[in-house]
Design a protein with these regions (language model features):
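Nucleotidyltransferase catalytic core that binds NTPs
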Residues: 1-156
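P-loop (Walker A) phosphate-binding loop of NTP-binding proteins
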Residues: 163
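Conserved glycine(s) of the Walker
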Residues: 167
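Conserved Walker
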Residues: 170
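Conserved nucleotide-sensing/catalytic segment adjacent to the nucleotide-binding pocket
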Residues: 198-245
Length: 339
């Protein structure tokens, strides 16, 4: 392949996917430097600064920039379409370009306007059969085509949380089955079973560390969703409830566990006794303690009520909303909590 001094790649990267990665990588391999212009578009689904950050993280050697204001997207919008784009690019590009890499036919005309050579990459989408439009319509179904940095940014981790005997473990499994995604079981149950229900203060640290390690291990699967049964806040509350104190490391692990949403389960289910449960008459107090912890820490949460299929349906509604808000500015949905 011919080598170029400075090449241009222009795109929306909404979101950045493996087709875009192929395009930029080809430009990098054939150029001393590559300038990537992330198109600042009207009514953007994903803010331009977030899209720029994805490209910068995925390709740290590329020069990434954008235009200050949105520009026409089709020549039919104005007779000055190519003049506007040429003048804008010449103004914002730090270096003159001698090649334009693109996967769309427009690249040929753009290259001509910039007095550069045009390099077409995978026009027929044979190497990477995907489009950003199809990804936006079905992020989970097209997950494998997203760039690694976008996958990390878009992934949602949901914690099922609350007092005893509210169906946390059951709901966690049901959600995982519904979305065909992995889940993390409550590590405390393993410890309690091993101790035949007779746990001590020192076990709380084991529970917190073990549960967090299980979450980290599950995240390595790199799936779009992960469901987690309880968290370190739960261990904090139970440590104080059972032993009147807590290990200093618990707060450390609470800070590490930033879930996209907590599904706080209400106490509207009957008590079912088993070896893992201790306070049948204090669920109401514990529920309010659970909620208070989320409020003071600024955690995103929704209260889940209902029995049987209705409970699952209510939880699915919030998870679906979380998924639909995946492309907002922060990278993490902030739903209105039902309080």
């Amino acid at each position: 392949m011919k080598h170029y001094k400075c090449s241009l790649v222009l795109g929306k990267f909404c979101p950045l996917h493996k087709g875009h990665m192929l395009l930029i990588q080809r430009a990098l391999e054939a150029s001393d430097m590559v300038e990537v212009v992330v198109d600042n578009i009207m009514d953007e689904v994903i803010p331009v600064r977030r899209r720029m950050q994805w490209v910068k993280q995925q390709f740290p050697t590329a020069i990434v920039t954008t235009q200050e204001h949105p520009l026409p997207q089709d020549p039919s919008e104005t007779t000055f379409f190519w003049d506007i784009w040429r003048d804008t690019l010449l103004r914002i590009l730090p270096h003159p370009v001698d090649a334009v890499f693109a996967s769309e036919p427009y690249g040929e005309r753009l290259a001509k306007e910039l007095s550069a050579e045009f390099v077409m990459v995978d026009l027929d989408r044979k190497s990477v059969p995907i489009s950003a439009t199809s990804i936006r319509k079905d992020m989970i179904g097209q997950w494998q085509y997203l760039s690694p940095v976008v996958q990390q940014d878009m992934r949602k981790v949901i914690c099922v949380y609350g007092p005893e005997s509210t169906g946390k473990s059951t709901l966690t499994r049901q959600l995982a089955q519904h979305y065909h995604m992995p889940y993390v079981e409550e590590f405390a149950k393993k410890v309690i079973n091993e101790k035949n229900g007779d746990i001590c203060y020192e076990d709380m640290e084991t529970i917190v560390v073990g549960h967090h390690e299980a979450i980290v291990e599950a995240l390595r699967q790199n799936t779009p969703l992960l469901f987690v049964d309880t968290d370190a806040i739960t261990s904090k509350l139970w440590s104080n409830e059972l032993f009147g104190k807590e290990s200093p490391i618990i707060e450390e692990y609470i800070a590490k566990q930033r879930f996209d949403i907590y599904l706080l389960l209400d106490i509207d289910l009957p008590w079912v006794n088993d070896i893992h449960r201790y306070r049948p008459n204090e669920r109401d107090v514990f529920f309010h303690q659970c909620e208070e912890q989320l409020v003071v820490r600024g955690r995103n949460y929704a209260i889940i009520r209902g029995k049987g299929k209705q409970r699952l349906s209510n939880a699915i509604e919030y998870v679906d909303r979380l998924i639909s808000h995946s492309f907002n500015a922060s990278g993490s949905a902030r739903l209105e909590s039902e309080k």
